[in-house]
């Protein structure tokens, strides 16, 4: 502001470098996420505009039908849905390609249509979901459609004793010498309307022959095992493959069920050796590695940010949702929730309880950990594994440990942080309402509020995100 009372150009910084928003991470890898933020302002205003309730959202914008709002469904599904449809379309359009998949749930009509279009060149190990009675089948309708279309279906009924919880796909070409794997797709996404659109999920596509061959070998073991964990399958699972080259990075590939919780030990070791910080998004994690992660946060002063749909461990009291100090309002970890009532111009989003009653039981369904993303050896853990004892010792699962790939780590870091930030605010509002506090009481016109940049949690946050600042 000049002496004349008008605005004038003053000192300014240089423009930041141009960035391109893309799923491509280089080295044949692309990372994909959906926009399943149902408890959000965007969806609250969408529902208000359409005159629908949270209970009606699933039928009108998620499940495929003649009346479904496909634009809303496409928005919620993001590049995750686009990529899953595209990989099936590529196989359907090329008679030389085949698709081999191991799936826990299959009920989304659009995805089932994609497999049906491939016909006999699609091979699927299909679980029976999470039934409570032996012999029941949550995927019965999809199984019938696939079989009628000539898809080669291998039944794998582990429930209710365990879950055949994989969601991986191997893409490859049929040659004179047999099936040649070329690509692998894995992640947290179940092939259901909620998996695509109303849960937060992720997927990773790797054009990588060695990894594709390893997942194909697992597919064959699962297909041959039927409804049990064969000795051959267990022996193979007990031999994780480490150090698979990926450009200048490496990948460790794990499958479960396995013996002795060696996968949990590996995850505990990873977070124990974190040097700067850890971000995570989880669905019903167990005690470990989360308990160790929280201990390391205190011992090493790590920057830790995370969201889980539900903390189920007996150590749940260790999860601090909100810090009491006004300057330390950041959550270390938060259970996903919505805005319970209108705050200013905010629209009512509904609550986590309403979500579970009308949409589904998973709000954040991703299973990912990012360790030291700005360090010399960033680590990403991603797959179907829920970081629990059941995932280790009972279920069919898979996960990758990607070491030293900065671009992949950045993709997962940004997604984890945006998820955390989204639910951090909602948890803060919920806490304020529960304690009858004004959520905006800490706002100040006094410039002294900036002093927090040099102390406490804000200082730790800035040093993590801007280590060169």
Predicted regions, residues:
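PLD/PLD-like phosphodiesterase catalytic module centered on the HKD motif
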Residues: 1-71, 81-85, 93-98, 112-198, ...
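A short, well-structured juxtamembrane/interface segment
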Residues: 79-89, 258-266
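Extended catalytic-interface subdomain
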Residues: 203, 214, 218-220, 232
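Charged, low-complexity amphipathic helices and coil/IDR segments
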Residues: 228-229
């Amino acid at each position: 502001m000049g002496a004349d009372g008008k605005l004038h150009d003053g000192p300014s910084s240089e423009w930041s470098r141009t960035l391109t928003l893309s799923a491509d991470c280089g080295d044949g890898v692309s990372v994909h996420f959906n926009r399943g933020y149902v408890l959000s302002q965007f969806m609250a205003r969408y529902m208000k505009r359409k005159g629908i309730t949270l209970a009606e959202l699933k039928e009108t914008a998620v499940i495929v039908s003649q009346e479904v709002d496909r634009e809303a469904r496409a928005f919620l599904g993001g590049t995750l849905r686009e990529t899953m449809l595209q990989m099936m379309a590529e196989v359907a359009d090329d008679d030389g390609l085949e698709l081999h998949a191991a799936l826990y749930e299959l009920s989304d009509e659009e995805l089932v249509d994609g497999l049906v279009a491939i016909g006999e060149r699609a091979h699927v190990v299909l679980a029976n979901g999470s039934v409570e009675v032996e012999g029941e089948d949550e995927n019965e309708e999809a199984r019938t459609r696939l079989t009628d279309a000539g898809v080669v279906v291998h039944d794998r009924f582990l429930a209710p004793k365990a879950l055949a919880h994989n969601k991986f796909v191997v893409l490859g070409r049929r040659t004179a010498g047999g099936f040649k794997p070329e690509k692998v797709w894995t992640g947290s996404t179940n092939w259901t309307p909620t998996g695509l659109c109303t849960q937060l999920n992720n997927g990773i596509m790797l054009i990588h022959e060695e990894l594709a061959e390893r997942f194909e070998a697992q597919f064959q073991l699962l297909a041959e095992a039927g409804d049990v964990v064969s000795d051959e399958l267990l022996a193979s699972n007990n031999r994780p493959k480490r150090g698979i080259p990926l450009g200048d990075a490496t990948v460790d590939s794990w499958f479960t069920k396995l013996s002795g919780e060696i996968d949990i030990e590996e995850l505990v070791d990873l977070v124990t050796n974190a040097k700067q910080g850890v971000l995570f998004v989880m669905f019903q994690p167990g005690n470990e590695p989360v308990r160790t992660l929280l201990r390391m946060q205190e011992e090493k002063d790590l920057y830790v940010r995370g969201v889980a749909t539900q903390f189920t461990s007996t150590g749940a009291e260790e999860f601090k949702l909100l810090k009491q100090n006004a300057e330390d309002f950041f959550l270390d970890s938060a259970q996903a929730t919505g805005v319970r009532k209108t705050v200013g111009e905010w629209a009512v989003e509904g609550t986590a309880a309403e979500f579970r009653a009308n949409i589904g039981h998973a709000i954040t369904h991703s299973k990912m950990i990012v360790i030291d993303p700005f360090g010399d050896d960033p680590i990403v853990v991603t797959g179907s594994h829920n970081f629990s004892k059941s995932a280790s010792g009972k279920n069919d699962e898979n996960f990758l440990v990607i070491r030293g790939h900065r671009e992949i780590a950045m993709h997962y870091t940004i997604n984890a942080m945006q998820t955390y930030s989204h639910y951090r605010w909602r948890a803060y509002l919920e806490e304020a309402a529960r304690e009858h506090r004004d959520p905006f009481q800490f706002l100040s016109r006094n410039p002294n509020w900036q002093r927090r940049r040099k102390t406490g949690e804000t200082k730790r946050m800035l040093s993590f995100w801007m280590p060169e600042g």
